[in-house]
Amino acid sequence: MKRIFLLAAGLAVAFAAMTPVSVAQTTSSAKAGGGQGKALTSKTIGSHADEVIGVFVNDANSQFATCSIDETIKLWSLPDGKELRTLTGHIGQVNNISYSGDDKYLASASSDRTVRIWNTETGAQEAVLKGHTAEVIGVYFSQDNSSVVASTSFDKTIKLWDWKLGVELKTLRGHSMQTNNVAYSYDGRLLASCSDDRTLKIWSTDAPVREALMTLEGHAAPVLTVLFSFDSKLLASSDQDGVIKIWSMPTGDLIRTINAHTGMIQDLSFAEDNKTIISGSIDGTVKSWNVESGENTMTHAAGVEVWSLDVTSNGNIIMLGCADGTVRLLSDSGNERGRAPKGGK
């Protein structure tokens, strides 16, 4: 879910007293040579003409999408990894993508300053949302409402849209630098954003509320990714220094810091168990972590900068978008559990 700009330099009442939040927590580090777990099989299934900076799997685990600096979006089938179609229309690199909760639509964010909505069955472009005054970096569908989507931008704002009506619902302001990513909680109550200002902000999804409910502090570098767990009880964030932080929700308590990678972390994804998180980095590795203990449970050397990733809900397949333009599937052939609805990204 990452983008090339990284290389350049009653809820409101309940949360009102919680800004900013900064508490004691546990720190863990990856050990050299540790956390290898089972060996994963890597398969390159196709490619874009340039870096692949976004990956998102649909809720049914039957399809995933990738986006690229080459200005295109590609749809792929699961589990076989067959390329289904290429979506074109953006006139700038496509920075991020998100499926709607019902899997019928895909939202994309681009440096052309637009958010576009696509029909995943036909490939038709359903809407073009204009309003940001700079590159659009993050995009995320509300998982309980397929007409509502959030976006972030270099213009420092978060915008909420009803794409079916073609209207901007509200603009959220508060970050002092570019906003990098956004995510809805899966219970539909909260929205999280992260920024180069090294903070995360938590917002209410209630229409009248425009002020941040809380600001989460603790990162020492620009925060690149933010993501809720399936059960909405945890929030994960990653930064340019290769650090992951785990926050308890809805309190905002910082419960764990993981010194995960030697390069910036381009993407994160929760597994369905709410206890496992997968990270990918420009250090060329993909790792899995137990969020309760901070243990590094798997390390895979991709041999190339990992720009984006996602994982099927049962954890059987990890999809990678890489700096060399390749799209890869990592799988554990010894773990063939049944499929379940996704919800961790």
Regions from the language model: what does each represent?
Residues 73-76, 115-118, 139, 158-161, ...:
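WD40-repeat beta-propellers
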Residues 45-52, 88-94, 129-136, 173-179, ...:
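WD40/WD-repeat beta-propeller blade N-cap
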Residues 67-70, 108-112, 152-155, 194-197, ...:
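Conserved strand-to-loop turn within each blade of WD40 beta-propeller repeats
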Residues 64, 106, 148-149, 191, ...:
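Hydrophobic beta-strand positions that form the internal "hydrophobic ladder"
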Residues 78-81, 120-123, 163-166, 205-208, ...:
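Short loop/turn segments that connect beta-strands within beta-propeller blades
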Residues 59-60, 101-102, 143-145, 186-187, ...:
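Residue-level detector of Asp-centered blade-edge/turn motifs that repeat once per structural unit
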Residues 30-49:
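A short helix->beta-strand "capping" segment at the edge of beta-propeller domains
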